Regions:
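Catalytic cores and adjacent binding grooves of peptidoglycan-active enzymes
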Residues: 129-139, 143-246
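Short acidic (Asp/Glu) patches
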Residues: 93, 124-127
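Extended, low-complexity, intrinsically disordered C-terminal regulatory tails
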Residues: 98-125
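N-terminal secretory targeting signals
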Residues: 1-45, 225-246
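Short His-Asn-centered micro-motif
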Residues: 89, 110-113, 143-145
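Active-site acidic/histidine clusters and adjacent loop/turn architecture
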Residues: 44-105
Length: 246
């Protein structure tokens, strides 16, 4: 289906700061499944977290409100990204959060999976965020309940996964070894990356937005390379708009 593009002004007007209020997180199936039982995390938990109950964010220019940014109507109003006529999240993201859940035995709390372009802009209207991979199902942010202040445990489970999984071991150090990303980013800790993914650690004073209102450090995983298509993964405006409207 066709939709109107999201427009931005070229002179980058400023945003009026808003106060983000803490909100309760959704209940996941494993939270009531009983001790020792692990329910798989599916793409359902990656759905857009927009809501028409969120207040508009006014944009100022020369002291005047020139625009209000509205959130989307939420996951009930649109699908996940569509690929090959099916709802799509990059499989490695689903595999990794399940691996973390299994390795730690603790709930993985996904705070932001897919973001439609409207919700992505509502979360962060800065120009640099408009190419976020959240919009194409290639990024997820999360923390692990019970390990909120021990993200290194979660990181180590990811590193161990790549080091012990045969399909990566057979392809060499491009996948099994992580290096640090030295370019400027929005985090104070240098990200980790291999050929397939890039991992960021957001400290409690970083990355707070409408999807991450909690006080904990959290991790972001971006997909860099699609092993299925053998192609680099990048944001595409066309792909970002390729979802079903309800």
């Amino acid at each position: 289906m066709a939709s109107s593009p999201i427009l931005r002004t070229s002179d980058s007007p400023s945003l009026i700061p808003t106060t983000l209020e803490p909100e309760s997180l959704p209940t996941y199936p494993w939270e009531s499944s009983g001790k020792g039982k692990i329910s798989p995390i599916t793409k359902e938990y990656f759905r857009c977290r927009g809501s028409d109950l969120n207040p508009p964010i006014p944009i100022l220019k020369d002291g005047k409100v020139v625009e209000n940014i509205f959130d989307c109507h939420g996951a009930d109003s649109h699908s996940l990204p569509i690929r090959h006529e099916k709802e799509f999240i990059y499989p490695i993201l689903i595999e990794l959060v399940n691996e973390i859940h299994s390795a730690t035995g603790k709930p993985v709390i996904i705070t932001s999976g897919h973001r439609c372009p409207s919700h992505n802009r509502y979360v962060d209207a800065e120009a640099k965020n408009q190419a976020s991979k959240h919009q194409v199902g290639a990024e997820v942010t999360f923390y692990v309940a019970g390990l909120e202040h021990n993200p290194e445990v979660v990181l180590n489970s990811i590193f161990a996964f790549y080091g012990s999984t045969p399909r990566y071991a057979s392809e060499g150090i491009e996948y099994t070894q992580f290096e640090r990303y030295d370019k400027e980013t929005d985090v104070s800790t240098k990200p980790w990356m291999n050929k397939e993914i890039l991992i960021k650690l957001y400290m409690p004073h970083e990355g707070r937005n409408a999807d991450n209102r909690h006080p904990f450090p959290y991790l972001s995983i971006q997909v860099r390379f699609d092993r299925e298509t053998n192609m680099r993964v990048a944001y595409s405006p066309t792909d970002a708009q390729h979802f079903l409207r309800r």
